[in-house]
Amino acid sequence: MITSLTEIQAQLYGDIQMPNHCHNRVTIYGSGNDTDETRAQIAKLKQIFEDENTFGQIIPEPDWPNMPLLTSDNLYGNKYGNDGELPQKVEDPWTRYVFISTGITDQRWYDWRVQNWDTKWDAYDVVVTDDDPDQLEVEFNTAWSPPEAICHAIREQYPDLAVSWFYDEPGCEYAGYL
């Protein structure tokens, strides 16, 4: 007996990937006159992409539990809590932090990530290929679209490295290079 929407979708559609997952294929390499410093930069980026907090190491996210609410956080009807209030940790893994005065979950991370990373989630389904110390190949998914801000930040932080970034979002049928 089928008991959930997920099971119904699996029965109807099989094991297909739902749209709005953007596939990213990134190749990072030196200039051809690779030095130990270039190789060290490639190794550092490899480590960053292998970690769970990939984008947060490239463009650091604020420490939300220690960020008091600002007046601007409560504009446009998004009343999270009282000005200056800190979110409190709760044991629910889905909500994690709540403003006690309103009971509303702290969602400030969402707008910040969209504005600063161009996507709501960090990289996921990451596969790193590092057969060559002078080159790094990484494939991963992001929500909705490629994280253009992350691509630009890597190029800015590592000017001696070349970055080739291809993305493909099959749900909306767009692809290209950054």
Enumerate the language-model features and the residues they cover.
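N-terminal amphipathic/basic-hydrophobic helices that include classical n-h-c signal peptides
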Residues: 1-17
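Long, contiguous binding/interaction regions
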Residues: 12, 16-178
